[in-house]
Amino acid sequence: MNPQESAQGTWEQESPRTALDVVYIEWHVHPFRAERWFEIWEPGAARAMAFGAKGWSLTRNVEDPLHFRQASVWEIRDDFERYWYSDEVSALREEAVNYYNKPLLPVWHVLIAGE
C-alpha cells in the first residue's frame, strides 16, 4: 500500500481464498428471559464448530445485559449457511423464538488482523 492509499484509509484485501470471514449476529433478548435464552442457544452456537467454523463466541454487553453478540469465524461462507439452516440449529432457534427480538441478521466482516 502506498502512502496516499494509507492516508485515504484504503487497504488491499487478501485473496478471498485465504481470508477468514467473521459473522456477527446481534441477539436482543426480552427482559427476564436472558438466562433461559442462553440455556437454549449456547449449544446451538457451539455447533458451529461441527460445520467448519474455526472459532465461535457469545458475548454479553455490560451496559445492556439483554444484548448478546454471537461471532464465528469461517473459511467458507457456505459452511455458515449449512450450519444456520441445519435442522438442529433451526430447531434451537425455534425453541428460543419467544425469548429474543426478530429479525436476526447475520453481518459479515473480513478478518484483517488478529491472533
Residue ranges and their predicted role:
Residues 21-28, 57-86:
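Short, well-ordered beta-strand segments in beta-rich or mixed alpha/beta enzyme
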Residues 49, 76, 80-99:
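Anionic, Ser/Thr-rich low-complexity intrinsically disordered regions
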Residues 20, 31, 38-42, 71-73, ...:
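Generic alpha-helical hydrophobic packing signal
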Residues 1-21, 55-67, 92-115:
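Glycine-rich beta-strand-turn "strand-cap" elements at beta-sheet edges
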Residues 24-28, 34, 109:
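A general secondary-structure boundary signal
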Residues 38, 46, 82-84, 102, ...:
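A beta-strand edge to alpha-helix "cap/lid" segment located at domain peripheries
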Residues 33-55, 88-92:
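Short amphipathic alpha-helical segments
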